[in-house]
Amino acid sequence: MTDRVALVTGAARGQGAAIVSRLRADGFGVAACDLRIDELNACVDALDDTGVIAVPLDVASADQWSTAVNTVVDRLGSLTTLVNNAGVLHRASLAEETPAGFERSWRVNCLGPFLGIRAVLDHLRRADGAAIVNTCSTGAIRPFPNHAAYGSSKWALRGLTQIAAAELAPSGIRVNAVFPGPIETPMLDEATQARLVAASVSGRLGKPVEVADAVSFLVSDHAAFITGAELVVDGGQCLRIG
């Protein structure tokens, strides 16, 4: 058992897997949560660490959130930290976007974090150093054409982060957000990665561990007086968008 226990969503690969590894290195017990059960189990098994557990979770299901939180507390002893990292991305023009595609983006990218915050509140209110980090996007800082579903859902998550930070500060719960730019993850296909590198101020994509480092800081005691913050991890991408 450890004093600090984090629940991380979207943890089967990419950024989420990097966040799990980094928080474990920081001394957290970590519940790695994802819909991709086989990938999740393989990722956690590879760590060979009893301080990391795999927990199936569809972030758009309130019932699954309740079950996941109970599992985490039963197996790891407490819950002090939530990282809402799960997300989906697809490109479509306004004319080509579908109601189903739009709704799926909102259910995963915004409803999911809301359900997560609600599910962990009782535990975080009892915790010392309680913290929540939401994974937003540079798409919630600048408007990206052909990203109506993704972009609008991340703008909403940005707003939810601010509201939660204001509401939960009196309870000692800090709520912050990271805003990754182009990161080398399975979410981006090779053609998209090449296009983003060509347009990058930094001449490269970010690495998942660089986002994980930002999350690590925001949930740590070094950020004890920081809430409602928006930490951009984009290699200068937003400097080139206007």
Language-model segments: what does each one mean?
Residues 2-30:
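Canonical Rossmann dinucleotide-binding motif of NAD(H)/NADP(H)-dependent dehydrogenases/reductases
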Residues 93-95, 101-103, 196:
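Substrate-binding pocket helix/loop in short-chain dehydrogenase/reductase
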Residues 117, 153, 161:
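Active-site helix of classical SDR
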Residues 122, 166-167, 224:
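Alpha-helical segment proximal to the catalytic Tyr-Lys
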Residues 137:
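Residue(s) in the substrate-gating loop at a strand-loop-helix junction
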Residues 142, 216, 227-242:
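Short C-terminal tail/terminal secondary-structure segment
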Residues 169, 174, 226-228:
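Short, small/polar-rich loop/turn modules that mediate ligand/substrate recognition or access, typified
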